[in-house]
């Protein structure tokens, strides 16, 4: 049911007839936090903390290489403690269901060195200065925490999605796929050409009623170019839903329910009753990943 004590979203008058606004996610946060470990990457240039999940500690063989899924969180999320694992869209990938979908995968959640200054301005969030240090962290993780990895996939939420583009643009021959969620920073054509030359797979996700960026002005003009890529799946839903089937509203001083497409992506593009949110993906995001990985 609608919670009438909540502020009405700016898009409330545009929702389809018969639809309702949902003010809460329906999944449990923290159920899989215990499966992650936290470590510190001690680097002279930029030390960072990170969370990780090791499939070989949870029933998968130690005698093979597994894919590495890297999750880049959105702005302020590094300040949320373990909850950042969920906000980055990584938590459910540690579940038995998701891990079995692609035969095991390492999960890595790097943390930007975020903080608030005396004027309450957020500092230390993802930007280009993190590109090389983050690449070094990833390589260090592979060398010290794994027995080798196969394909490398970068997920990103919001500002983390923009950072995922920056990482793959800087190291195109290193990464195999990226899944940016909620970023308007689609690279220019010559960069997308490099993605194609290196067989990089792109899953581009952006809600048409995103409160932070205009789909019509910033995304739609770039869709034809994305469609020309060798490996690009485009997911731009009319509405972002919570698990109860309601149109999602999140407001912590500013409405962002439609920007937080990460929640639908994290729950594998399915509602609680099993309804599939995109008929092209009957097995959700994990099904797309399984196909990409050749499983």
Question: What role is predicted for each listed range?
Answer:
Residues 59-64, 118-158:
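Gly/Ser-rich "nucleophile elbow"/oxyanion-hole loop immediately N-terminal to the catalytic nucleophile
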Residues 161-172:
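Short glycine-enriched nucleophile-adjacent loop
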Residues 86-98, 162, 184-194:
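Alpha-helical scaffolding within the catalytic cores
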Residues 103, 196-202:
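Short, proline-enriched alpha-helix->beta-strand connector loops that line the catalytic pocket
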Residues 68, 74-132:
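Active-site machinery of serine-nucleophile hydrolases
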Residues 173-185:
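A conserved short beta-strand
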Residues 1-67, 157, 162, 222, ...:
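A domain-start/cap signature at the N-terminus of enzymes
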Residues 203-205, 209-217, 227-295:
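C-terminal catalytic histidine-bearing segment of alpha/beta-hydrolase fold enzymes
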